[in-house]
A protein has these predicted regions:
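Extracytoplasmic
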Residues: 38-69
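Residue-level signature of mid-helix packing/kink "hotspots" within the transmembrane helices
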Residues: 54, 82-90, 174-175
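Extracellular/periplasmic helix-loop-helix junction of adjacent transmembrane segments
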Residues: 59-86
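Interfacial helix-cap and linker-helix signal at transmembrane-aqueous boundaries
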Residues: 63-64, 95-96, 183-188
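Helix-breaking motifs and short loop linkers at transmembrane-helix boundaries and internal kinks
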Residues: 68, 100, 121-127, 138, ...
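Conserved MFS/SLC helix-loop-helix module at the cytosolic interface between two early adjacent transmembrane helices
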Residues: 87-123
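Cytoplasmic helix-loop-helix junction between adjacent transmembrane helices
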Residues: 131-171
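Helix-loop-helix hairpin linking two adjacent transmembrane segments in secondary transporters
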Residues: 166, 170-197
Length: 197
C-alpha cells in the first residue's frame, strides 16, 4: 500500500512521496502470506552471528597481541573454528531432518550466545580456541535449519524475496560488526563487543 500524496514544490523542485512505503508494509510485501515474525527472528539470528564473526576478524590484531600469538597461531585458530563449523553443519543438518528445526535453531542460538559471551571472558589460548570453536555453532545451525524453515513457511512464489531478505542479514552484520566492534573496543577493550553482541 502506497501513501497517497500530491506532488509538492520544495525549494523549486517537485517531489512526490507516492512511491514511499511504510517499513512494515514493505516487510509484509516481502513475507507475503508467510510468517513475518519468524522471518524477522531468523534475520536477526543470522545478522548477530555475522556481527560476532566480523567482530572477531576486526579485533584479531588485539586478540593476537593479548594471547602473544603470531600470525601462524592466529590463522590456526581461525582455521580450527572454520573446520568445527563445517563438521557441525553436517551433523546438525542430519539432526534437522529428524527433529524439530525450530528447537534446533533455538538451542543453537542459545549455545552460540553463550560461547560468544564467553569469548570476552577468555583467559588463555586453549580456552579461547574452545569458545571460538563453540561459537561456530551459530553458522552451523543457521544454514541447514533456517533454509528449510523458510522453505516450509513460504510459498514458492515468495521464496526469492524471502531468501534475499534473509541473506541480507549477512551484509548487515558484516557491515555493522566492524563498526560497532571497533567503537566498543576503542572505548572498553577488545572483550566488550563479545560481551555485548
Amino acid at each position: 500500500m502506497m501513501f497517497p500524496s500530491r506532488p509538492k514544490l520544495v525549494g523549486g523542485m517537485v517531489t512526490c512521496l507516492s512511491t514511499v512505503r511504510h517499513p512494515v508494509l514493505a516487510l509484509r510485501r516481502i513475507a507475503g502470506d508467510g510468517p513475518l515474525y519468524g522471518l524477522l527472528v531468523l534475520f536477526g539470528l543470522n545478522a548477530v552471528d555475522e556481527l560476532d564473526r566480523s567482530a572477531f576478524g576486526i579485533l584479531a590484531p588485539e586478540i593476537r597481541d593479548e594471547f602473544s600469538l603470531g600470525f601462524q597461531g592466529l590463522l590456526t585458530l581461525i582455521a580450527t573454528v572454520a573446520a568445527v563449523a563445517l563438521a557441525l553443519q553436517v551433523v546438525i543438518a542430519g539432526m534437522a531432518d529428524r527433529h524439530s528445526r525450530v528447537r534446533i535453531a533455538i538451542a543453537g542460538a542459545l549455545a552460540w550466545s553463550m560461547f560468544s559471551f564467553t569469548t570476552g571472558l577468555a583467559t588463555g589460548l586453549v580456552f579461547l580456541g574452545i569458545v571460538r570453536s563453540g561459537s561456530a555453532v551459530g553458522k552451523a545451525v543457521n544454514d541447514p535449519t533456517h533454509n528449510s524453515l523458510l522453505a516450509d513457511w513460504f510459498p514458492p512464489e515468495s521464496r526469492a524475496r524471502v531468501f534475499s531478505f534473509h541473506r541480507a542479514a549477512n551484509a548487515v552484520g558484516a557491515g555493522l560488526g566492524p563498526l560497532f566492534a571497533g567503537i566498543l573496543a576503542f572505548r572498553f577493550g577488545w572483550r566488550a563487543p563479545f560481551l555485548i553482541f
